[in-house]
């Protein structure tokens, strides 16, 4: 089976009726990832969950059209730092230009944004020009009085941008007379493990959901040189699996105790992923991780408000005057986040290889053992960004 990582975030911006100093922009994705994951963990029930901090990119575009308190909150909580919006846009475009051009290095990413506008509303031309130049965003008009045609148009575009992994996401009910702008941000990620897992070593084993409950699922295994660490502070093991021809890795953080995930995530709320990754060194490791798939759908409005982004969601408080030609009250009423993750022996959306050689497992008493047979945290990252972060709790 092919494997794919696909991130999709959709912001619905309907019409409502009736300068902080921060860390550098280059550091903001790492810190934002920590803050978002921490806020989300406070709200969601204990189920498989995954989120992409690339959500910050969609909200940065909202920041470009925001004013007053709305802009101040977004600047502060997105950790944009620079008060000049043109500099924010320029630096943002430069950082993502490097990331999205890495296909030749073994990892492929596609990050695209599109604005869908009720044809009764008009977007400022300067905002639209900026969105296209710096955010790879395009604006398109829709007739919300004809929701069937509108939903077909949007769903068709989403399918194409996600290589047909996301289908029929929207329903006609989304396009109603109260809606004004739909901002869609899509991140597609595809990669192959630097060292794939031998198929013949994948076996069905127990996965402990808690000390009293277990389920069977396929567990992949291999032995190799990987970045590995043990943290007394986190009471966890740390493992980084690299992707082929890339500086990106999938990091696993495995609590020592079967029921240690909650305490681990509480401690992780005080650290960023770079700090965690720094605790690992190259070691020979016997690795066993589950073959798993996550489909996660999250309402981001609650965690974003918990982080302090409130004004843009509140009627009579939101200021999006930089988006529309006419001055009228607007607010973001809903934020949906949908993501898919499929982890296999080969990586991400990579077909099985016919020339994979069997692996002989030799004994080595100095070898570290990393067996993820209980709930764990994972992150797909490099030193500059956290692209996905989540936890796996049960099959």
Model-based region annotation:
Residues 2-395:
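Secretory/exported precursors with cleavable N-terminal leaders
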């Amino acid at each position: 089976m092919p494997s794919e990582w696909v991130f999709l975030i959709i912001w619905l911006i309907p019409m409502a009726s009736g300068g902080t100093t921060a860390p550098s922009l280059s550091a903001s994705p790492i810190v934002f990832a920590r803050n978002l994951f921490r806020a989300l963990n406070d709200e969601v029930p204990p189920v498989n969950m995954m989120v992409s901090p690339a959500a910050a990119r969609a909200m940065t575009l909202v920041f470009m059209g925001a004013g007053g308190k709305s802009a101040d909150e977004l600047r502060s909580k997105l950790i944009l730092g620079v008060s000049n919006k043109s500099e924010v846009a320029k630096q943002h475009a430069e950082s993502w230009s490097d990331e999205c051009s890495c296909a030749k290095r073994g990892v492929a990413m596609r990050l695209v944004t599109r604005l869908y506008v009720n044809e009764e509303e008009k977007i400022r031309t300067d905002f639209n020009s900026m969105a296209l130049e710096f955010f790879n965003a395009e604006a398109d008009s829709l007739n919300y009085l004809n929701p069937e045609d509108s939903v077909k148009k949007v769903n068709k575009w989403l399918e194409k941008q996600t290589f047909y992994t996301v289908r029929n996401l929207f329903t006609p009910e989304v396009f109603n007379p109260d809606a004004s702008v739909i901002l869609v941000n899509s991140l597609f990620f595809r990669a192959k493990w630097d060292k794939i897992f031998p198929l013949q070593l994948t076996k069905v084993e127990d996965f402990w959901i808690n000390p009293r409950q277990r389920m069977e699922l396929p567990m992949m295994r291999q032995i190799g040189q990987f970045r590995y660490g043990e943290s007394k502070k986190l009471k966890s093991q740390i493992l980084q699996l690299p992707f082929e021809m890339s500086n990106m890795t999938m990091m696993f953080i495995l609590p020592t105790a079967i029921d240690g995930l909650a305490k681990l995530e509480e401690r992780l709320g005080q650290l960023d992923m770079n700090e965690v990754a720094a605790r690992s060194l190259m070691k020979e490791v016997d690795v066993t991780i589950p073959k798993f798939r996550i489909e996660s759908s999250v309402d981001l409005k609650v965690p974003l408000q918990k982080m302090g982004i409130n004004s843009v969601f509140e009627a009579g408080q939101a200021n999006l005057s930089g988006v529309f030609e006419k001055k009228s009250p607007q607010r973001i009423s809903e934020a949906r986040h949908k993501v898919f993750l499929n982890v296999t022996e080969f990586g991400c959306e990579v077909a099985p290889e016919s020339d994979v050689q069997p692996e002989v497992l030799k004994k080595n008493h100095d070898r570290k053992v990393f067996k993820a047979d209980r709930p764990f945290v994972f992150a797909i990252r490099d030193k500059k960004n956290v692209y996905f972060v989540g936890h796996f709790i049960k099959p």
